Amino acid sequence: MKFELDTTQGRARRGRLIFDRGTVETPAFMPVGTYGTVKGMTPEEVRATGADILLGNTFHLWLRPGEEIMRKHGDLHDFMNWQRPILTDSGGFQVFSLGDIRKITEEGVHFRSPINGEKIFLDPEKSMQIQDSLGSDVVMIFDECTPYPATEDEARKSMQMSLRWAQRSRDEFDRLENPNALFGIIQGGVYEDLRDESLTGLVNIGFDGYAIGGLAVGEPKPDMHRILEHVCPQIPADKPRYLMGVGKPEDLVEGVRRGVDMFDCVMPTRNARNGHLFTSEGVIKIRNARHRDDTAPLDEKCDCYTCKNYSRAYLYHLDRCNEILGARLNTIHNLRYYQMLMEGLRGAIETGTLDAFVSDFYTGLGREVPEVPELVD
């Protein structure tokens, strides 16, 4: 992987990630394909929304279908017929989400399979081996996602163990002679000094990119912004910056303003299946009866297949009848909305018009532009 940085405006960055399987323009949003599929979508449909890269889930793909079946197909690209870049998370967040059915030790994590209750052990070495079998273009280190809330002492112990796991991930990745990219994950909760210690340790180990983890786990939005403002300028400028698990459209805008290059989130797909649709004028809840006879598209400014061909009334009808097509059309729209937002942000950074773009974005939502510190380095 090669990262090229073209231009900046304030802390916002315009660049690209270059892989053997294709180029990813940044800032980029990655749709989530947890089980090797973006729910309800063919790879061709996902690509048509403008997506250059997908996120796959190491933990779930390890449990089903497993490494053996994956290797029989070649790798995850062949298994799901997506021949463009794939980033896989390490499984750390999914283990964190298991709660009481897992036990974390220095060696790794003991847990029971959420599928059949089988006892399973996952550690940094195994995570690297699984991601190697998946053929991931970007491999994430195995870490512990610091919960929120956590005391500073709890966050410190978690972060320091994640650093030790980062070294083990690096060592196993190198032993496997994996030719792809390996990203470190910055932890430390909402504590700036711990984030500093985490980043310093990761840079000393050396990675191809750096993710900001442990956010979007329940902390107040001002805390997320504060950590981004503190951490982003300290990440080596020649490495991509990835904010994990974020988020709403406004979170992407605010992340880009603070220097983030990559995002992922289940929100556009999950919300689509629940009838919550993102538009340039805010969220439309298609289940609302006001849309029953509305012949307008979801968003006049959207060029997606759904908006070009179907009315709000039709989408309301599909939802009321619980038709699968409704969820598919909604997903196409939401994913295209997110990609159009990223395209707009990239173009605005290129032309030095980011402030105007951000102002127009919030005006469309009927909101004031949030104040941010003078974000210059």
UniProtKB/Swiss-Prot annotation:
Its cofactor is Zn(2+). It catalyses: 7-aminomethyl-7-carbaguanine + guanosine(34) in tRNA = 7-aminomethyl-7-carbaguanosine(34) in tRNA + guanine. Substrate binds at residues 89-93, 143, 187, 214. InterPro entries: ArchSynthase1/Queuine_TRR, TGT, TGT-like_sf, tRNA_ribo_trans-like. One of its GO terms (molecular function) is tRNA-guanosine(34) queuine transglycosylase activity. One of its GO terms (cellular component) is cytosol. GO terms for biological process: queuosine biosynthetic process; tRNA wobble guanine modification; tRNA-guanine transglycosylation. Its EC number is 2.4.2.29. The keyword Plastid does not apply. Pathway: tRNA modification; tRNA-queuosine biosynthesis. Coiled coil: none annotated. Gene3D superfamilies: Queuine tRNA-ribosyltransferase-like (3.20.20.105). The active site is at 89 (proton acceptor), 264 (nucleophile). Homodimer. Within each dimer, one monomer is responsible for RNA recognition and catalysis, while the other monomer binds to the replacement base PreQ1. Catalyzes the base-exchange of a guanine (G) residue with the queuine precursor 7-aminomethyl-7-deazaguanine (PreQ1) at position 34 (anticodon wobble position) in tRNAs with GU(N) anticodons (tRNA-Asp, -Asn, -His and -Tyr). Catalysis occurs through a double-displacement mechanism. The nucleophile active site attacks the C1' of nucleotide 34 to detach the guanine base from the RNA, forming a covalent enzyme-RNA intermediate. The proton acceptor active site deprotonates the incoming PreQ1, allowing a nucleophilic attack on the C1' of the ribose to form the product. PANTHER family: QUEUINE TRNA-RIBOSYLTRANSFERASE. Belongs to the queuine tRNA-ribosyltransferase family. HAMAP family: Q_tRNA_Tgt. This is Queuine tRNA-ribosyltransferase. It comes from Shewanella denitrificans (strain OS217 / ATCC BAA-1090 / DSM 15013). The gene is tgt.
